[in-house]
């Protein structure tokens, strides 16, 4: 399959934007995580998520070209130079996590969802997307294993367990927004780009959350914003930080 329809393009941008911003959020914990091993782990996970985003942006910039020959500037334009209203990220990946318990809870909630999301495009008719999914599925599995390892240690401890569960409760309304139907998703499914809508995996993710934290997402009210077109208040400062180096010399070729 080559040549992207408008709906498939929107579908892929939402996917890429989530991976990009989650990678950036993880990267902001490098050097300030509670212990050195987590500096290194979050650095590695951030690189993976940013790599996933780059692969998805390249598919969009290259119009689905199986050769994957996308212009680097076109990829950078998608990643850094769109206006806020043109982004399709979920607010869940936009909000700041200034507390380690919050960051760890989001790490688990996100990767438990993304593992399911990437599986939906593993057999995509869009060849470069299927190839990207092969790597991403392996990496998301490792990400989830990392988060689970920490949670196995921290949840049984009263103080840390209480803080993590409180963070999960705080994040759940926004995390449900990851499953909101994306503009163009119906077209992507009809064209075989994805095997099913992402919200068909919500029940599986809900059961994972219930089993991991003893908290039922089905009892939580969703955030009032949906559709991935309304930016959170934390988005503007996050985007400014992401553009900081580009802003030093907009004409430079990196």
Predicted feature residues:
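A contiguous pocket-lining binding segment that forms or flanks enzyme active sites
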Residues: 128-190
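Internal, conserved structured core segments that host functional sites
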Residues: 91-146
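Acidic/His metal-coordination segments adjacent to aromatic residues that form catalytic metal sites
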Residues: 1-13, 80-107, 157-158, 171-191
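Helix-loop segments that flank and shape redox-cofactor active sites
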Residues: 22-44, 114-129
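Amphipathic, well-ordered alpha-helical segments in soluble domains
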Residues: 18-26, 52, 56, 110-117, ...
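Conserved alpha-helical segments that form or flank metal/cofactor-binding pockets of metalloenzymes
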Residues: 46-81, 147-155
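Extended, helix-rich structural scaffolds rather than catalytic motifs
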Residues: 162-254
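Hydrophobic packing residues in well-ordered alpha-helices of helical domains and bundles
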Residues: 12, 42, 104, 133, ...
């Amino acid at each position: 399959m080559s040549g992207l329809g408008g709906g498939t393009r929107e579908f892929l941008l939402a996917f890429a934007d989530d991976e990009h911003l989650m990678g950036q959020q993880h990267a902001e914990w490098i050097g300030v995580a509670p212990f050195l091993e987590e500096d290194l782990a979050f650095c590695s996970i951030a690189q993976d998520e940013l790599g996933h985003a780059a692969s998805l942006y390249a598919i969009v910039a290259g119009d689905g070209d199986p050769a994957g020959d996308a212009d680097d500037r076109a990829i950078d334009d998608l990643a850094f130079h769109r206006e806020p209203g043109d982004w399709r990220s979920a607010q869940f990946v936009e909000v700041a996590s200034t507390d380690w318990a919050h960051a760890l809870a989001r790490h688990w909630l996100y990767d438990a969802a993304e593992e399911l999301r990437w599986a939906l495009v593993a057999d995509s008719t869009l060849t470069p997307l299927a190839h990207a999914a092969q790597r991403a599925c392996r990496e998301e599995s490792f990400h989830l294993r990392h988060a689970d390892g920490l949670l196995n240690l921290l949840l049984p401890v009263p103080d840390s367990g209480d803080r993590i569960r409180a963070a999960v409760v705080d994040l759940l309304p926004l995390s449900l927004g990851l499953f909101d139907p994306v503009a163009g998703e119906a077209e992507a499914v009809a064209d075989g780009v994805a095997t099913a809508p992402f919200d068909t995996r919500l029940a599986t993710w809900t059961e994972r959350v219930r089993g991991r934290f003893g908290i039922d997402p089905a009892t939580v009210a969703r955030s009032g914003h949906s559709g991935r077109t309304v930016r959170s208040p934390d988005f503007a400062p996050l985007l400014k930080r992401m553009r900081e180096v580009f802003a030093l010399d907009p004409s430079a070729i990196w």
